[in-house]
């Protein structure tokens, strides 16, 4: 789909992160302009011209590579205005287009010598070391030009493939090879630096190595077996992703778009720049110097030193401080590399992609709401009016209370009773989501029915606290409003707090009474030592139903721990040890009375129960009545 602003919409199924091949890196940065010119390679370390304040050509902010700094205007100013769209200026070579292309167009730096990628060399585990089946220390010695490695032992009897040699050892072997009496025809080959590493990785035939490892694993055990499995797993991943091991050594490095590493002018005329520009500048300077040294056929020791410095510059760009000395800028502050921008809490993923601010959300301190039902939460009116504002405006206009959105907003700002009435109608049956960070499991975000409350704190039912791992010592929670009917339905069906009683991890109840609930239940049902037990028939202590006991307690005629006789026709689980009744009496009308310690039953002539009185405390009646009432409502 394309509109007049050249915006394109690409549909894709998934995002896949794999190793990039050298060709892919070049593809990212290389473009062919409409006039057939190929651009993309950054060859100069300059950023902007200090007099004209325009980007330098072929530099880190080059307009030819990355696009124009100003919309529809080329570098030299020959073409201005949108009518020249797509034209490439003959003088400066800049394509006339929007400046926002500088946010996604990349460049590349073609390296004069291969360089190892520090993530794969110095990461934990080191994938390069695992693939080559060499100690990491040895691989580092090769990459940083401390030791030679044997790439091909030739006819030399003492040399082995992948053996390390110091400078002196290799000089001795060279003397031996080129001596007049030498019998070596097939000369051994050695290498040093990332070039040698690349050669070793290219020599790996992954399917063959995987097959050999599987055979070795079947006949080995213990630590050796674990090491072989570790290596096989890495090789299998390379095969599965169609990646080559030598891609871990870079021939070209991508240059990220200039608007992602900006340079801005401050009030005093000075410039503030992203650390990445300094790191890229070091790489380009060293790369250009190395290319020049190679051109003039400089001594090997000087070229080798420059290659090592280039390796260190690329290491600092990718992950500053991972190896060697940390590169610092002004006032001894370490420069932020690409890895520092991506990783950690303040990194691109956690801060900007996963931690985005979202619309229709808010946050506030939580306080206990003991009078709420479990599926309810108290939402401050001030917060609710802001979160549900579009719904309130829609309803105000639909009910002809106001004529337009502007009038509705003015009315909402006054927050009079009419608006509050509409807000109450809007939130009725509209669930909201409450989330407490850190969301460690799925019960860290649950749905509730909002109830409007005064104040500025969110009220939370105490029973849902264990699921959120919340307490009321200053914890904050975020509120989100599901907008679509589908998301509201999903929230109500799947995420409502009263539907999430069991822990998804263990299957045990996660909503269990605690603290004052347990204490209150204990206090209600506790028996007071030494309390007098009334005789059955005592008018002040015998009641015809549970409600009568509660009314008497509310009228303060009886206390919470007083014993009472109360008529109760339900099932009674009696823990009385006496199987026979204490007293049995046959009345003149043929009915029979049986009395136990805590129960008095009356039966008719056929043995059917006529009435039952139980001896209990007022607190236990309150507890029982409350449970029956709650179950009946549910």
UniProtKB/Swiss-Prot annotation:
Bound cofactor: record note: Binds 1 Mg(2+) ion per subunit.
InterPro entries listed in its UniProt record: DNA-dir_RpoC1_gamma, DNA-dir_RpoC_beta_prime, RNA_pol_asu, RNA_pol_N, RNA_pol_Rpb1_1, RNA_pol_Rpb1_3, RNA_pol_Rpb1_3_sf, RNA_pol_Rpb1_clamp_domain
Protein role: DNA-dependent RNA polymerase catalyzes the transcription of DNA into RNA using the four ribonucleoside triphosphates as substrates.
Catalytic activity line of the entry: RNA(n) + a ribonucleoside 5'-triphosphate = RNA(n+1) + diphosphate
Record: residues binding Mg(2+): 471, 473, 475
Higher taxonomy: Bacteria, Bacillati, Cyanobacteriota, Cyanophyceae, Synechococcales
NCBIfam families, alphabetized: PRK02625.1, rpoC1_cyan
Protein name per the record: DNA-directed RNA polymerase subunit gamma
Keyword vocabulary terms for this entry: DNA-directed RNA polymerase, Magnesium, Metal-binding, Nucleotidyltransferase, Transcription, Transferase, Zinc
Any GO CC annotation of this UniProt entry: DNA-directed RNA polymerase complex
GO molecular function: DNA binding; DNA-directed RNA polymerase activity; magnesium ion binding; zinc ion binding
GO BP annotation list: DNA-templated transcription
Cofactors that this protein relies on: Mg(2+); Zn(2+)
Protein family: Belongs to the RNA polymerase beta' chain family. RpoC1 subfamily.
Annotated residues for binding of Zn(2+): 74, 76, 89, 92
């Amino acid at each position: 789909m394309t509109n007049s602003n050249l915006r394109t919409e690409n549909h894709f199924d998934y995002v896949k992160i794999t190793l990039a091949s050298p060709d892919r890196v070049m593809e990212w940065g290389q473009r062919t302009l409409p006039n057939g010119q190929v651009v993309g390679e950054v060859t100069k370390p300059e950023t902007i011209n200090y007099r004209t304040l325009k980007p330098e050509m072929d530099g880190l902010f080059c307009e030819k590579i990355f696009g124009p700094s100003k919309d529809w205007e080329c570098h030299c100013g020959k073409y201005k205005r949108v009518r020249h769209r797509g034209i490439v200026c003959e003088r400066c070579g800049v394509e006339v287009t929007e400046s926002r292309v500088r946010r996604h167009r990349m460049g590349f730096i073609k390296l004069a010598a291969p360089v190892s990628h520090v993530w794969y060399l110095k990461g934990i585990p080191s994938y390069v070391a695992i693939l080559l089946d060499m100690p990491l220390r040895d691989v580092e010695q090769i990459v940083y030009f401390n030791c030679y490695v044997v790439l091909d032992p030739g006819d030399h009897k003492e040399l082995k493939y992948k053996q390390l040699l110091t400078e002196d050892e290799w000089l001795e072997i060279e003397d031996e090879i080129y001596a007049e009496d030498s019998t070596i025809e097939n000369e051994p080959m050695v290498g040093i630096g990332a070039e040698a590493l690349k050669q070793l990785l290219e020599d790996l035939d992954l399917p063959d190595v995987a097959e050999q490892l599987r055979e070795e694993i079947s006949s080995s055990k213990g630590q050796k077996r674990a090491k072989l499995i570790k290596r096989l797993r890495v090789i299998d991943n390379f095969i599965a992703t169609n990646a080559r091991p030598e891609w871990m050594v870079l021939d070209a490095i991508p240059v990220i778009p200039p608007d992602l590493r900006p340079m801005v002018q401050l009030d005093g005329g000075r410039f503030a720049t992203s650390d990445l520009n300094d790191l890229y500048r070091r790489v380009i300077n060293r790369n250009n110097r190395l290319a020049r040294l190679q051109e003039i056929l400089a001594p090997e020791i000087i070229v080798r030193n420059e290659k090592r410095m280039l390796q260190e510059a690329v290491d600092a760009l990718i992950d500053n401080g991972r190896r060697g000395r940390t590169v610092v800028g002004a006032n001894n502050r370490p420069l932020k590399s690409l890895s520092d921008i991506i990783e950690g809490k303040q990194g691109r993923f956690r801060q900007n992609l996963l931690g985005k601010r979202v619309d229709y959300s808010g946050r506030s301190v939580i306080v206990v709401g003991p009078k709420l039902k479990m599926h309810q939460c108290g939402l401050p009116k001030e917060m609710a009016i802001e979160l549900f504002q579009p719904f309130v405006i829609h309803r105000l206009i639909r009910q002809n209370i106001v004529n337009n959105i502007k009038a509705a907003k003015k009315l909402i700002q006054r927050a009079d009773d009419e608006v509050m009435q509409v807000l109450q109608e809007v939130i009725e049956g509209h669930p909201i989501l409450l989330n407490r960070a850190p969301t460690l499991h799925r019960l860290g975000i649950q749905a509730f029915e909002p109830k409007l409350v005064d104040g500025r704190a969110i009220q939370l039912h105490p029973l849902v606290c264990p699921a959120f791992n919340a307490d009321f010592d200053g914890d904050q929670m975020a509120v989100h409003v599901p907008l679509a009917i589908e998301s509201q339905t999903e929230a109500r069906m799947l995420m409502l707090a009263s539907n999430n009683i069991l822990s998804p991890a263990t299957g045990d109840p996660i909503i269990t009474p605690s603290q004052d609930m347990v204490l209150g239940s204990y206090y209600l049902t506790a028996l007071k030592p030494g309390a007098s037990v009334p005789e059955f028939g005592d008018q002040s202590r015998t009641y015809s139903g549970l409600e009568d006991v509660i009314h008497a307690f509310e009228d303060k005629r009886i206390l919470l721990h007083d014993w009472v006789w109360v008529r109760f026709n339900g099932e009674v689980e009696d823990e009385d040890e006496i199987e026979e009744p204490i007293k049995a009496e046959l009345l003149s009308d043929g009915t029979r009375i049986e009395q136990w310690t805590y129960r008095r039953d009356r039966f008719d002539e056929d043995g059917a129960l006529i009435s039952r009185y139980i001896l209990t405390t007022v607190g236990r009646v309150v507890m029982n009545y409350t449970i029956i009432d709650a179950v009946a409502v549910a």
